[in-house]
Amino acid sequence: MSDFQIIFEYCRCSKVRIPARAQVSEAILLAEGQKSAVTEYYLNNGEWPENNTSAGVASASDIKGKYVESVTVANGVVTAKMKPSGVNKEIQGKKLSLWAKRENGSVKWFCGQPVTRNDAKDDTVTAAAGNGGKNNAIDTKHLPSTCRDTSSAE
């Protein structure tokens, strides 16, 4: 086998096996891109934005990437959903959320398991419900250590 063939085989194989964690990093980056708009809305209005439009960001289906299907803002919670195909099987259709809570006149952001906030005027979040009682959360083994918060995070 020539050097070229070895390099070609290596590239061909490695392209197929992009680790789930690398794919999840795209979701985190896209979700984090919405944080400043959500924070600004809260600081100006005293409540969390109800949706992407009120936050002043693109529609959920327009915030997407190679592995991410959509990024939704709902009552200040930013949730990224992975695509149902073309991604690592362990994260297909799974979600992660970023959310903030008020802290001394500012906001503190959290990242981790998917959550929901029922009231835009409240900081309380709960674990998101999903199919069959599962919340479609990305397994923590695929999340960086800085993005493993749960709804009870303080």
What are these regions (language model features)?
Residues 1-39:
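Amphipathic alpha-helical segments typified by the pilin-like N-terminal helix
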Residues 43-154:
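Periplasmic/extracellular, small/polar-rich flexible segments of pilin-like filament-forming proteins
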